[in-house]
């Protein structure tokens, strides 16, 4: 029984281009696929014929041989005199993933299974800032080692003027089918490692990798208000992708150094302010530091050690809302005088006596409560 002309099988002509052949195959394959026509032997045979025609006409070498010698170009032991004869076997054991992979992928770019595009890896860079830099914002230059798209082969890994070779083992699918008893098992093609093609002539600069190692310098704009563990994302500044895929991102991890004066808690700053016991008792005014210079801080009379005094708007601007700014909280530390001379000691002794001794109820209410508590504690023990 003579075979039908492959062009007529697909409903195309000898002048039809690759795109028209793919569209025709897609339409017919979806119509006659065995999964859509279970138990229909005619559809199964029709699908097998359609697939056979497509696999010949989509391959430039096989199509040329068919145009010259017809079906005899693919028969074993043919006598056409052509040394470049083809042998080919066809199978109807194709599922819809074959059609979508071979046809839809081809129509929307590429020939059969292209070498996988893989997005580049993300990178991390640890940046240390002073508190002033973190609060005000800054611009830092950093140098990072990374992988960049090879400028010679544009990331494809092939020698100039060449292209990846179509894998003959899997016919560009990246998978091969092996029969084991009643089952058909798919496995990764051992020749192209699942890529569908392979590089016969690799680029000399990148040795076929498509990427080269470089060290690049970047300027990083740090916004005001960042804090330790914040991250700044630089899009597409990570490693270059493979086979034309997008590059990864670079994440700059912020670490703020400990400051000799200020401690930060979210948008508020804290500092310790030592004052004399006389100022703590009588009140007064003292200069305290801020990140923007010195300011006056009013000390109320009878201020106790550990009291927090707030200076509004002298903290850190919010990174999310620049109209909001934290406060500076001054923790008062009342210093006990040291290195006293005899006169000072005498004056302090007299001052203490004026308080009705060092347990004066009126002048030292906390001391009074403390010693009363101590007395009750020991009384309870002796009962």
From Swiss-Prot:
Instruction: Give the Gene3D superfamilies listed for this entry.
Output: DnaJ domain, Heat shock protein DnaJ, cysteine-rich domain, Urease metallochaperone UreE, N-terminal domain
Where it sits in the cell: the answer is: Cytoplasm
Q: Does the keyword Cytoplasm apply?
A: yes
* Zinc finger residue extent: CR-type: 137-215
Q: What are the record's GO terms for cellular component?
A: cytoplasm
Cofactor(s) demanded:
Zn(2+)
A Gene Ontology biological process term: chaperone cofactor-dependent protein refolding
Q: Where does Zn(2+) 2 bind?
A: 167, 170, 189, 192
* SMART domains reported for this sequence: DnaJ (SM00271)
InterPro entries in UniProt: DnaJ, DnaJ_C, DnaJ_domain, DnaJ_domain_CS, HSP40/DnaJ_pept-bd, HSP_DnaJ_Cys-rich_dom, HSP_DnaJ_Cys-rich_dom_sf, J_dom_sf
Could you tell me the keywords of this UniProt record?
A: Chaperone, Cytoplasm, DNA replication, Metal-binding, Repeat, Stress response, Zinc, Zinc-finger
The protein's GO terms of the molecular function aspect are: ATP binding; heat shock protein binding; unfolded protein binding; zinc ion binding
Report the SS bond pairs. Answer: none
UniProt record similarity statement: Belongs to the DnaJ family.
User: What note about domains is in the entry?
Assistant: The J domain is necessary and sufficient to stimulate DnaK ATPase activity. Zinc center 1 plays an important role in the autonomous, DnaK-independent chaperone activity of DnaJ. Zinc center 2 is essential for interaction with DnaK and for DnaJ activity.
Q: Which PANTHER family match?
A: CHAPERONE PROTEIN DNAJ, DNAJ HOMOLOG 1, MITOCHONDRIAL-RELATED
* Record function comment: Participates actively in the response to hyperosmotic and heat shock by preventing the aggregation of stress-denatured proteins and by disaggregating proteins, also in an autonomous, DnaK-independent fashion. Unfolded proteins bind initially to DnaJ; upon interaction with the DnaJ-bound protein, DnaK hydrolyzes its bound ATP, resulting in the formation of a stable complex. GrpE releases ADP from DnaK; ATP binding to DnaK triggers the release of the substrate protein, thus completing the reaction cycle.
Subunit architecture: Homodimer.
Q: What is this protein called?
A: Chaperone protein DnaJ
> What species is given as this protein's source?
Buchnera aphidicola subsp. Baizongia pistaciae (strain Bp)
Q: State which gene encodes it.
A: dnaJ
């Amino acid at each position: 029984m003579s075979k039908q002309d492959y062009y007529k099988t697909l409903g195309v002509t000898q002048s039809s281009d690759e795109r028209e052949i793919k569209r025709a195959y897609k339409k017919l394959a979806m119509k006659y696929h065995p999964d859509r026509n279970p138990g229909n032997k005619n559809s199964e045979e029709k699908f097998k014929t359609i697939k056979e025609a497509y696999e010949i006409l989509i391959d430039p070498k096989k199509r040329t041989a068919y145009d010259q010698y017809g079906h005899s170009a693919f028969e074993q032991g043919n006598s056409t005199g052509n040394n470049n004869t083809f042998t080919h076997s066809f199978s109807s054991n194709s599922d819809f993933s074959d059609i979508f992979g071979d046809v839809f992928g081809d129509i929307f770019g590429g020939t059969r299974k292209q070498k996988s595009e893989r997005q580049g890896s993300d990178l991390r860079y640890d940046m240390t800032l002073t508190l002033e830099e973190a609060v005000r914002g800054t611009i830092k230059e950093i140098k990072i080692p990374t992988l960049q798209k090879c400028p010679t082969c544009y990331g494809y890994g092939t020698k100039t003027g060449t292209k990846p070779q179509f894998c003959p083992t899997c016919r560009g699918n990246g998978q091969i089918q092996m029969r084991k008893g009643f089952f058909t098992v798919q496995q990764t093609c051992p020749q192209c490692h699942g890529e569908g093609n392979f590089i016969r002539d690799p680029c000399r600069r990148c040795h076929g990798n498509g990427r080269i190692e470089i060290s690049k310098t970047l300027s990083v704009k740090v916004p005001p208000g960042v804090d330790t563990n914040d991250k700044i994302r630089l899009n597409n500044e990570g490693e270059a992708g493979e086979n034309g895929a997008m590059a990864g991102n670079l994440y700059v991890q912020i670490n703020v150094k400990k400051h000799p004066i200020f401690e930060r808690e979210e948008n508020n700053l804290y500092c310790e302010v030592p004052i004399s016991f006389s100022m703590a008792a009588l009140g007064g005014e003292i200069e305290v530091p801020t990140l923007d210079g010195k300011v006056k801080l009013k000390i109320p009379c009878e201020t106790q050690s550990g009291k927090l005094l707030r200076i509004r708007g002298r903290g850190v601007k919010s990174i999310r809302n620049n109209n909001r700014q934290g406060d500076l909280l001054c923790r008062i530390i009342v210093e006990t005088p040291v290195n006293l001379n005899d006169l000072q000691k005498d004056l302090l002794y007299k001052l203490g006596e004026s308080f009705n001794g060092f347990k004066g109820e009126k002048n030292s209410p906390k001391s009074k409560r403390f010693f009363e508590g101590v007395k009750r504690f020991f009384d309870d023990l002796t009962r």
